[in-house]
């Protein structure tokens, strides 16, 4: 007789009532959205012009998008019709991860303002409000039932390992990981209700459109602070979508409609140069396509002539030249 040892549990990190935790998470996310419409600094010396009321700019846009995602995931926990599609795994881990990403982006922005402009005095009240409500959202999300590793399943604690990994990860990440203990989802991902083919194709097209926009937004960032904030938001956002099971659901649709997926990928690649503000990436792409075509042609010609070894050399040589261009 074999014993099954559970390595995961669904428990909150902070012992507060689930209803109160979810309500606070929703409220915190909504307030974070509102805070992006306030000025975070009084001077436009910081890139992105975060001085305007009623119009988010620069890094505020990243906080806004992350906060909206947090609001959607937290609200989906109430069983709102239509929102269940975005969290088929029914896991609160996605809510916590995107809330953590919102917090990290917001605090990175405000700290960058203070460091670059010479102190917290350069922050407007809106900046302090954003810091407070994003922190509230993360704390509230820790009160939701999270899928966590059991204490028994963690690596055995040892002070040398703890100190070493804490130093490597910046003295914060590893201790927090051991404290929060986020684990995998023990439940099966719910299968979506069958949709008409045209609706599934629209979802695939929309997914490729969003992916193209996110990619082009990242490579077109105009300053380092925005790029770092972009990396933070995308990393936590993708992790949240993965834990929610949404990436798996989209993957299932693309597998079902392979031809449509291939067409969508080609259309996205064709549209990519038209999304650029300069010709740099378009020229690189054109050069790669030219040499890829030459390599394919050489391979076909020498292959028909029976000179297969020469074909391999030609293909690799042209590929190496194209890679050097990149």
What positions do the PLM features span?
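Short, intrinsically disordered terminal tails adjacent to the first/last structured region
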Residues: 1-11, 18, 25, 93-97
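Membrane-interfacial amphipathic/re-entrant helices at transmembrane-helix boundaries
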Residues: 11-24, 28-66, 107-130, 151-291
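Canonical alpha-helical transmembrane segments
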Residues: 66-84, 236-245, 303
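Hydrophobic core segments of alpha-helical transmembrane domains
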Residues: 67-78, 131-145
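Single transmembrane alpha-helix segments in multi-pass membrane proteins
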Residues: 70-71, 278-326
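Cytoplasmic-side transmembrane-helix entry/capping segments in multi-pass membrane proteins
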Residues: 89-99, 251-262, 284-290, 310-318
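Short, solvent-exposed interaction modules
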Residues: 91-114
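Alpha-helical membrane-associated segments of multi-pass integral membrane proteins
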Residues: 121-140, 309
